[in-house]
Amino acid sequence: MALDEKFQLEVIHLLLQFLNDYGYDESLKALEKETGLVSETEDVKRLKQAVLQGDWITAEAAFSIMQLRDESKRKEAQFLLQKQRCLELARSGAICEAIYVLQNFESTDFNKEKERLVSIILESNNKSNNELITKNGYGNTRLDLLNQLSEYISPEILLPKRRLEHLLQQAKDYQVSSQVYHNVLKNFSFLSDYKADPSELPTKEYHVFHDHSDEVWQISYSHNGRYLASASKDKTAIIFDVVNLKRVFRLIGHIDTVAYIRWSPDDRYLLSCSCDKSVILWDAFTGEKLRDYKHGFSVSCCCWLPDGLSFITGSPDCHITHWSLNGEILYKWEDVNIYDMALTSDGTKLYIVGFEQLINAEDKHIAIYSVETRECIKKISLQSKVTSICLSKDSKYALTNLEPHTTFLWDLEENRIVRQYMGHKLGNFLIGSCFGGKDDTFVLSGSEDDKIRIWHRESGKLLATLSGHVKCVNYVAYNPVDPYQFASAGDDNTVRIWSNKDNPRRQ
């Protein structure tokens, strides 16, 4: 494909910057000589040298003649120069001179920022200057300033930092995202197109655990990916070793269905929620029952706080309860019949889904609570009943299963649905879905038609429909360490491990 003249010139500029950045001086000189182009104009060199040497008068003069991307932003960029000059004066102890520089910057658009800076500078006069200034977000170096200024200057004059690498990363990201089977990046090269095939999906039934005598309602992987815990209608929970494919402990202590189970952040403990109105704390290393937490009604779900010192439970009696490990109730909210809950990775926000039958209507919503203030931040009303919620690793997205046959992907920063996944059957049971793959590139869900479905998260394309269970698949969970393994739990009393490879023991 022939490049037009403008495109050729832009490519040459990119190459010149690349050679300059990586110290290929002879190659740079040769390309400049052959093309008649330069990696940097004399004006740009003067600006860079002045900033790096702290020659602020020369820097201001050099910047004043620069062509900008947006001329209306010139004062904003000039303020960056003055701010750096001011902060360096303050760090050196020249407090009065630093404040004078700020007060003599002619624009009034930055008065609030100037007032804040003056306050910090005056306070720093009585403390460690550098520490206080850096602590308040003003620790940029001169090189940082140059990079900031480059964002204002026209790219025809000064290319943004490492522009070629940035473009190559964009090309790489695009190629990877366009491959619906992409899971783990292998052997990527810019010399050929990236391809990912279906072997990246864990679609093979690797092992079946038959240890339960009744329906398995929920499963949970340990954070180290070595163990899987299951919750069953047979009133027990089981810890499985998914490496050696064996049962480790059967946890006996509940007198009714075990509905939900979760590992502590350090994998030292397990919490099991039951229809017998209790939550039990277990020692995951020994299988020993450590403590009972009594409720007034059955308990449907729970989640741990990141420090592992407390946890939250949800119940059909519309109560959300924050517990300490020693059994103290720290706080209690009242909402709706709680089906499921999820906590952001930083432990600041609690998402709950539930349903309540009112006199003349039904209340179906997602509620978001601040763990710190304990206030309800937002309630999102829904048309259908939500049976489960699962957060992405970065806590920016959530999956919810809605009756009768849709899994929705939510953008949690904007609180809106961005994608939907269809084909499965939801309705009579509480079916769980989850993210999967190394970078959460897949979406998985159980179904009342005994199948498991895997979709490409970004496109919504159905990638695989898996058979194996002979009754409703209640829950799926993805191994947090092994990107090629997930587990499923069903009403056929089994827990199944899925992989992208065959189990040699079953052949």
Swiss-Prot record:
Oligomeric form and interacting partners: Identified in the GID/CTLH complex. In the absence of stress, the complex exists as an inactive anticipatory complex (GID(Ant)), composed of Gid1, the E3 ubiquitin-ligase Gid2, Gid5, Gid8, and the RING-like subunit Gid9, awaiting a substrate receptor to form the active E3 ligase complex. When cells are shifted to glucose-containing medium, the substrate receptor Gid4 is induced and becomes part of the complex, named GID(SR4). Additionally, Gid7 transforms the GID(SR4) E3 ligase core into a higher-order supramolecular assembly (Chelator-GID(SR4)).
User: Which stretches are WD repeats?
Assistant: 211-250, 253-292, 294-334, 342-380, 381-420, 425-467, 468-507
Q: Name one GO cellular component term.
A: nucleus
Location of this chain's protein in the cell: Cytoplasm; Nucleus
Family matches, as Pfam families: WD40 (PF00400)
- Would the keyword Transcription turn up in this protein's UniProt record? no
Its BP terms in the Gene Ontology are: negative regulation of gluconeogenesis; proteasome-mediated ubiquitin-dependent protein catabolic process
Q: Which residues form the CTLH domain?
A: 40-97
State its role: Component of the GID E3 ligase complex recruiting N termini and catalyzing ubiquitination of proteins targeted for degradation. GID E3 is regulated through assembly with interchangeable N-degron-binding substrate receptors induced by distinct environmental perturbations. Required for the adaptation to the presence of glucose in the growth medium; mediates in association with the substrate receptor VID24/GID4 the degradation of enzymes involved in gluconeogenesis when cells are shifted to glucose-containing medium.
Task: Extract the SUPFAM superfamilies matched here.
Answer: WD40 repeat-like
The Swiss-Prot or TrEMBL record describes its family as follows: Belongs to the GID7 family.
Protein name as it appears in the record: GID complex subunit 7
Point out the gene that encodes the protein.
Answer: gid7
Q: Which CDD domains match?
A: WD40
Q: Which UniProt keywords apply?
A: Cytoplasm, Nucleus, Repeat, WD repeat
Give coiled-coil spans as residue ranges. Answer: none
Q: Which residues form the LisH domain?
A: 7-39
SMART domains documented for this protein: CTLH, LisH, WD40
Q: Where does this protein come from, organism-wise?
A: Schizosaccharomyces pombe (strain 972 / ATCC 24843)
- Does the entry feature the keyword Nucleus, yes or no? yes
Which PANTHER family is this protein grouped with?
WD REPEAT PROTEIN 26-RELATED (PTHR22838), WD REPEAT-CONTAINING PROTEIN 26 (PTHR22838:SF0)
